[in-house]
Design a protein with these regions (language model features):
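A short acidic (Asp/Glu
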Residues: 42-43, 110
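Structural beta-sheet core signal
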Residues: 32-34, 57, 99
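Alpha/beta-hydrolase-fold serine-hydrolase catalytic core, especially in secreted/extracellular enzymes
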Residues: 1-28, 50-53, 61-287
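Gly/Ala-rich beta-loop-alpha elbow adjacent to hydrolase catalytic centers
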Residues: 31-42
């Protein structure tokens, strides 16, 4: 999954920091921060890796009950059966989490058709989360998390959306939660030196997309051999009566590791229909 690929890159950086910490007499704290899509990646990374001591998530945290309206990569199969954003936040607890309710750009997918781009992409909308939804999910997160958990919500006047991300209050909370106590002059209005200024990321973005494409192409090239070794060789021809028993471990792996499993049908059939279209010659029903 594309979210997993991005998370793995963050965790690789955490590996590097942890390796550097092992060389030092006093380990430096490890924190992650992200805005908008980066907030999603920081959020999931912190839930997975306990070495991350403090996390700042800006412009992402909210209720996910309508995740199907968002871009398709966010609509992870079976996610909402167990995990809304509050549940993910509880996985970070008791480590520190700073949630910044900031404004995000509105994006509507798919992009317009143009030369080289077809109209085949799935629809989806990204927009600034509503304040009511953010407050409600924050309240759920606090109830689900361990007693004394440090989950700070940064908003404008305690109830409105911030116009910018990475505000002084959010960054200071992140530093304090990471046990880095900033001095009175920790912030500056000066621009970073030329060496620290990021160049437009278009070329870097293209390289990362190319990495993902090549990685998946490589998996496709070798998948036949992997399937033979890990699957078919473990299912040699046998008596038909033993086939179901032979397949059971692979069936469970498919359910648990690949596509998920629908719950068993334990309710009576309840078909329903509704009229969706009518002409002078026929009526169409949805069943």
């Amino acid at each position: 999954h594309v979210i997993g690929y991005e998370v793995q890159k963050v965790l690789a950086v955490v590996d590097w920091f942890a390796a550097e910490n092992a060389k030092q007499p006093i380990a430096a704290p490890i924190a992650v921060a992200g805005y908008h899509e980066g907030g999603l990646i920081a959020f999931y990374s912190a839930a997975l890796d306990t070495r991350i001591q403090a996390t700042l998530v800006s412009g992402y945290f909210t209720e996910r009950n309508r995740v199907w309206e968002e871009p398709i990569y966010r609509n992870v199969f079976g996610l909402l059966e167990q995990f809304g954003d509050a549940e993910i936040a509880s996985l970070i607890s008791p480590r520190a989490l700073v949630l910044e309710h900031s404004k995000t750009p509105k994006l509507v997918a798919p992009p317009e058709v143009r030369p080289g781009r077809s109209s085949g992409a799935a629809p989806g909308i990204l927009a600034t989360p509503s304040t009511a939804n953010v407050l409600a999910e924050h309240g759920r997160a606090k109830k689900l998390s361990a007693k004394g958990s440090r989950i700070a919500l940064i908003t404008k006047n305690d109830k409105n959306t911030l116009e910018t991300f990475g505000t002084d209050r959010a960054l200071e909370a992140l530093l304090r939660f990471a046990n880095v106590i900033p001095n009175a002059n920790w912030k500056t209005s000066k621009e970073p030196t030329k060496e620290l200024q990021s160049k437009p990321p278009h070329h870097r973005q293209q390289r990362q997309v190319s990495e993902l494409v090549e990685y998946n192409q490589r998996l496709l090239r070798f998948s036949e051999y992997e399937r033979t070794e890990s699957f078919w060789r473990k299912l040699p021809p046998a008596e038909p009566a033993k086939w179901n028993a032979q397949c059971e471990p692979h069936r469970k792996q498919l359910w648990k590791e690949v596509i998920g499993q629908f719950p068993a049908a334990n309710l009576p059939i309840n078909p329903r229909s509704r009229k969706i279209l009518e002409t002078d010659k026929w009526i169409c029903y949805e069943v």
